């Protein structure tokens, strides 16, 4: 150990942050030397090392190690010098000897120094270990050495070491080193020790250390053996190490761990209460996150007053303060470490060198000269400048902050919901403009992608470049939608403007917009959260890059969707961008895990280059050579970089393009209606190589059904059943209605899917909207700790909500037993599976178990270890909740706003609470994981052969209604059977839920929302009924009356009554049915009441009435008791019958023939509204006198002639255990459907009694083979009857049956009871009017008998009601007002009669007199049956109900006035009850006008009367006068005035107004109300016996006997007693029910189609479509305006370029003149340069005159000569002319006026002859022009919707032309023919269009044209520059033109391969075409092409003149394409 006296006080000891490194000075003989702590551990050993080396010689060991360190340090300094040299050369190489060792030293490597000798450097373990560690870099690199950067000697830097172009290389190197060291040291802190593998085998650790997590939850870090395996698997093994090296490495690891700051536990807000929650959040942020500050001023080499960190010297004045803060932080950490017994920290650290300069040559380093301190900037920023400030959260963090802490900050401190997708946007950092349409599409797509998927958008956060376009997308969203979108900005702290304003803890910073000029930038105001990343520098990029990468990689690897096992996907979106963007894309596509990238083509720069490279890269991953050259030049031009940098960028582009599966190019308009959002999501699906199930899961998590429909299910995969079931479960839980519909379209079997466990799980999920289910469950069952919803409890809730004695199937004993068995099996399977999945915790809502990560312990950056050690905030655990929610949950508040959160708050280990909501527990495991296993087990055991639920859609609809999922409930209503019943039940449930919500005083909108949902289902039920009625009325009547076994055995008609759906029951279909039921077997059209009364009075009159036929009576609903009796009687009668089979066969054959004819007749008829013989008018209601129909003998034989076959078949069916049915109700036997009713009634014999009819109608046709043929016809009562049935319909019933049908009709029962009641009232009135004798008379006994019988009937109704509990029976009975009146009347009469008999007669008489009021009111009950009186009775009842509120107010007013009046007027009274009467008596009568004028003011009246009598003055209050004046006598008259104003005028007027309103409202609905009440009347008198009181007890006695017999005969286990079911139903078998369901489903489809058509043709939809089309037209006009503006700019630019070209041409002409004058050119040549107005001038010696250019508008004489010259050379093939039909928006326009010249700005002379201009000699190369203009203006459009910078690149396909979605870029091959070899074909950058311009020389030149040669000039070196054309083409070539071009290419190719001399001669004879000829055909010529072609005639003219002058002239030289401008000029000069 080094002592303090060994160090000098002047020595500088520097200590940087512990996490990075510690540098100390070690004395060595004459001085000190600086070493790293990794190599100085032997000098400063830890206590462990000290104990191991006590016996050794310390001094000797120290000296030996110092010698070794000296040699190593010497070599390191040498290498450092080389590294610094490389760094100065801008080569990014890591320094050796620092924390990150990038150099690899192999033990056997041959490393020699400069002299060739072996250095003394020995292999060291620590550097080797670190080098291996950093080879396994998992992020920030493109692995595999795709583009290695060469380092020093044997070192090479991979992609992760290469900094982005805008990041300082040293900063990048240091930041990577710091982050890597921090990850490594965290592993050591967590107890992970490296045991390196030796040559002989693995080194086994002596002990196994386990470190527990700080969260206290028992999660432990893997043991060292596990860490060892992970270390070996990660590729960090080190071989060839000695034991001493291992020891040093272990000691070094221990020393490093001693200096490590232990990570702060993840924030868990459940640990804190509400009072200190905010404070603890702030403390946690301050303790967890750090900032980085510069600790020493080291002057920069460029500016001595500025530090290497970028700040000035004055900004470093706070270094002493930072030092103190740093020391305080270290001491606190040391104390913490000492408490944890990790190691001791040396606090005696000299920090004076933190702000002093060590040496003159020292360079500033981020690792050495920065320290990490606690963050001092976090809070809220308010962006000003808008209508209201936008608020955002921000925090300043260090660049090496762990992503786990950041995620904890997001989810728990800032309360951000976990992401389901990460969209990271990259692009240009400087401002740029997008094309208008592309900008609109990008904004719309990004907003849709973020809002629909729950994504997080991550940007740089700076208010420049691509971030502005992201902000524009968010601006288009609504405020509510924008608040849900999470946009996170990761911005560099050092580049932030006014960053000093952000410094403060929990500070609110007002932020005002500022200019974006300068190096620093501001924050964008559309972001919600900001991470201000700090690396200690100012004005530099790079800090945010590292943190952003680490955060994105952490999310993609460790963050899970919905807490399951699927990681959150990350996608990159590229918009424009520079070289840094290309580097980022390269990292994304080459890192692990891969990140898909979406590139927006047409946005500019990097995006366009990436899109072009992706499209044109070949299969071998390279670009074609010709395209590569053009792209290389375009890269140089676009980015303004050097050639080497351009090559590097091009290589990176190529590498990116090789990953085609990861790159998705979005091209506007290419994919139809698909926008950017579709491209983003499809890129994720195709870029991650996911299975179909995983793709479906992602689409489901994003809630993008369009992606699933177009990209997942469109591939034709064979989907396993389990995958579809899991997806359906997820869709149901998360309320994904569209996905449910999509999965149903894929053919999922819902009966197999929906099991008891899954339904139980659905009720217990905590996802979905808030609902009131828990509150209602708490009312019906006792809720305890850890309660979970159970299906039997849900059944109780349904029964409570439905009311009216509704019985749910969940509460039956059969279902309860089944539920218990299933739950036991689930628990058993779960326990059994725990042995296999013990390491997998339970899931909470994702449907997939969460598995613990088995990856290596990579530190906090890895994520899994942090979740296991420091808390459960990540992975599969639910996030903690806000304390407000917990408090509301504990207090039992019934507020609904946080109901779901309330239930979720109790899912963890929280204190017990008696009001605790349900806990999910392991429900997901039970439901979705073990269902298949349970089904297999059940199938193997044979215990389950049918699905758990017959109608799964009905069960799911109830679940959706109870959990308030309206869209899901609507979806389930549209699917499945019994749609009408489902709509009615949903309406009732919603109404009851709304009532419960109103009673609980929940939010008003919740109640109103539930009422709205109920109204929607009510309307749907009515629409469905109306549609079915118009399709087929007969089947609709059956739908209303058949028994619904799944809905408490009710009917749709009964459900409508329960729902109180007045409009439903008022429908004509229901009224027809009720009218038929009311009349029973009677057929009466007019005066039915009079006829029935006459029949009751005179029974013989019954025979004169009209009745229904026998067949019509068979098709009527019946009660359950009648149905049971019919089956029993039919069984007994059929068993005693016998007949021959021959007659049966004959009868059956005849029936079959008739049926076949009937079916053939009806087969082709369309479905219309049919009116069959079994319509509603033929239905009948039977009474409760069951025995009256069942008096036939049981042993009566069947008629042999008619019913032999029926009896025989019935006997066989009874023997097989079958059942029978009657009246349209058939039993089910072996799945064979019985025949229709009319066949059962077919008989040729006459029935002598009704037992014959009953026998025949109740026989079942089941087993006879002849009858089975009849059953195949499937004819029901709704089909058109055959002729036999029509013949049978005329048969009438017998006399005895007439009496029975008359007395059993409800109308007859009603009149019998009414007449009886009238007689009772008459006798009762008589007894009250006469004197009451002491003894009761006969009339009184009759009356008491009547009342007693009436009371017994009421008791029977109560007992036989459907409700099971007795109190429920009483409650149901009392709900009726008339029942209450009846009970009170009966009780008072019995009390009064007994008082009259056994007590005081007078008092008894009084009681009876009062009771007469109630009996008289009972008359209104009978009157309500009348269609006119009934509505008025309803109105009166409603008025009385509403009048009660006014009466209460009136009583208060009476009391206030009456009490004051009584007390003042009569002050001396003693107490008596009459005083209370006086308070109300007279004031009440004052309301009706009786004001008691004499008693108003008695004192004043007497004084006035005395005044009138005596004539004296008016004296008041004088005692001598004897006046009765009391104190305050004047007050009562004053009070009475106000009383009459309020009571008599105000309240009475209000009461009258209310009555008027009630009358008006009721009058409108009076008919509906009466029709609704009519059902109750029909059902009441149907269940009432015909015998009225006092004869009713006779019926009761018979009923008791039947009940006893039924109980004795029925089994004890039978729950349903048919005697208590009086509802009228049709009992159908399964086949008939299936037919009804088919009919209902067909009507549902027709109704849905009709509603869809109505919606599409509605005015709203038309207006919407018109609005959309108007927007499209407006956007198109905007695009056209933009194109027009762009065209103007291009034209202006072309004009300016032409002016510059003309200027250059004049200069060239001057040069040519000078050259010719120097060479003593002939006089003719000299005359050439003097422009002459005469174009045809010859010299005296015959030499040609000036060479002229023939342009449009020149002299017609020349045109004729040119024409003649062209005719002479017709034999030669014409030149290739390419005519592109293009629409240009830029320059190149040529006027057609004759006096307009193309290139000369000078006007023509006075004579009108245009002036001639000489041609230029040199090529008009566009390179001298500004490159910026060329890159922006020279664009040829390949796409109709947008332009790209790559449009100027010419694409050449040698073999075939590839036509893609863009506009065709034609290739033009120009020939460069050499005099000595063949021609070679080159690719022109422009579209192939040969513009051959012909010169117009003088006459001498024309004569010698045959000797002239034409030279073609091409410049491949400047190919890319020429490619940047200045016209934008918007048309494409046609197919015909394309074929012509191909032919021309073939001809040109053949010409190019001709012999050179032959070709040369052919070229001499080749005619030249004039420019006028080309332009005359309407072709638009590019001015650059014109200028280039002008070079040819000048060269030709010069050569001719040379030849004529006798100069030696060799073979014509043809300018090669590779010739540059200098070469061409020199060649021309030499020729001259």
UniProtKB/Swiss-Prot annotation:
GO terms for biological process: defecation; gonad development; metal ion transport; mitotic cell cycle; monoatomic cation transmembrane transport; monoatomic cation transport. Keywords: Ion channel, Ion transport, Membrane, Transmembrane, Transmembrane helix, Transport. Residues 1935-1947 have a biased composition (Acidic residues). Residues 129-162, 197-223, 831-860, 912-945, 1120-1211, 1753-1779, 1853-1909, 1935-1982, 1999-2032 are annotated as: Disordered. Residues 839-855, 935-945, 1120-1129, 1171-1185, 2016-2032 have a biased composition (Polar residues). The chain crosses the membrane at residues 1310-1330, 1332-1352, 1374-1394, 1439-1459, 1535-1555. Belongs to the transient receptor (TC 1.A.4) family. LTrpC subfamily. Required for initiation and continuation of postembryonic mitotic cell divisions of gonadal cells Z1 and Z4. Zygotic expression is necessary for hermaphrodite fertility. May be a cation channel. This is Transient receptor potential channel. It comes from Caenorhabditis elegans. The lineage of its organism: Eukaryota, Metazoa, Ecdysozoa, Nematoda, Chromadorea.
